């Protein structure tokens, strides 16, 4: 940082460039149960000591600015300031540190993810004294989490609404994602639902384009839901994407979905924004709608290891803002997702209490104090050969979503859905019999092919499809 340059006014006021360490680096501080705790990966500029960098992060994300100001004397900075209370080097890195910052609860508006992020991941990420900055994790105290509604319904309520127990749920994103007419789109939904899937889904960028306006899509998809329910005797759903250019338009679409009597709507929570998402989540709880969340834009924020924000933080924020499902990677598919890291934030989405576990990237113990859980959705480049691994990795409380892995079946959409349903039922039965899905998965799928020609055809098509790239974001 710049050297201390001070001038003394006649009343004793000192102005100049601050040395942040003097005020915001407090290694003796004992954190409170009510503090929001943050773990930042800090990469200082050459010549900036880690204590100064960590203190600068604490200052610029709470009460501080670059100089001393007159109005500092009009409040209690000790009560409101963030504190960098611990620093540790990142293993294998010469110029990176994990800096732990504690924020007093009074800095944040109740029930507002928007306000929380505006402070913690605001202007500080452009601070010149840092080459890079990444928020790795947050500890949300029960005192603060209790000010949020959280998911509209949660895992158990969703199962009760759908009357589906003891297995993962199956979904399919309709493809091509853009260009279909509303009627053809609804036809594809019907075929997939009739074939055995629980859900079909709007792609994240399907909103209301010239080739398919939202109201037409909603009507044809509702027809597909009711027709497939009548034929199969199962409750079905389609994630109707309510994301829009304004909150008012988003709510108009959600209201129309409720009037159609469908069970679930959808929102792109990062591009749509946390304020819009929380508004929609409150409406969904009040009106009995499930809420599916897509994380479009997340990789812009979370994929680089040195800068941005880890997805586990975005996952916690979503649980607070509200959503019943969220896309969470696949481990085995085409999208980024290292196994232990993915399992770490899957637990943060579903469980009531999660212990600190650095081996899975969890920096803090998190107690959600009975806030409803969120179902993780595995989607992206998966097919029937992945079913044993997905069932073993994600367990029953998950949605396994096959887009191309359903619609790419050589015999059509309904046979593609049937192949996925047979593969899932075979894996669940084998698991319940005590078989090892990780070791015997391929054998289980081959055995099921003998009595399901649809599955046999799918296995032949996708037998050589793999996405074998090393993940970018890994445990240190």
From Swiss-Prot:
Amino-acid positions noted as binding substrate in the UniProt annotation, renumbered to this chain: 123, 173, 177, 295, 327, 379
Record-listed N-acetylproline modification sites: 3
Keywords of this entry: Acetylation, Calvin cycle, Carbon dioxide fixation, Chloroplast, Disulfide bond, Lyase, Magnesium, Metal-binding, Methylation, Monooxygenase, Oxidoreductase, Photorespiration, Photosynthesis, Plastid
Binding-site residues, Mg(2+): 201, 203-204
Residue(s) carrying N6-carboxylysine: 201
EC code: 4.1.1.39
Main location: plastid
Signal peptide positions on this chain: none
Entry-linked SUPFAM superfamilies: RuBisCo, C-terminal domain, RuBisCO, large subunit, small (N-terminal) domain
GO molecular function (one): monooxygenase activity
InterPro entries: RuBisCO, RuBisCo_large_chain_AS, RuBisCO_lsu_C, RuBisCO_lsu_C_sf, RuBisCO_lsu_fd_N, RuBisCO_lsu_N_sf, RuBisCO_lsuI
Post-translational modification: The disulfide bond which can form in the large chain dimeric partners within the hexadecamer appears to be associated with oxidative stress and protein turnover.
GO biological process: photorespiration; reductive pentose-phosphate cycle
Protein's cellular compartments: Plastid, Chloroplast
Propeptide feature: residues: 1-2
Any one GO cellular component localisation term in the record: chloroplast
Superkingdom to which the source organism belongs: Eukaryota
Cofactor note: Binds 1 Mg(2+) ion per subunit.
Record-marked site positions (Transition state stabilizer): 334
Cofactor(s) the protein requires to work: Mg(2+)
More details: The basic functional RuBisCO is composed of a large chain homodimer in a 'head-to-tail' conformation. In form I RuBisCO this homodimer is arranged in a barrel-like tetramer with the small subunits forming a tetrameric 'cap' on each end of the 'barrel'.
Family: Belongs to the RuBisCO large chain family. Type I subfamily.
Subunit field text: Heterohexadecamer of 8 large chains and 8 small chains; disulfide-linked. The disulfide link is formed within the large subunit homodimers.
Protein name listed in UniProt: Ribulose bisphosphate carboxylase large chain
Species of origin: Brachypodium distachyon
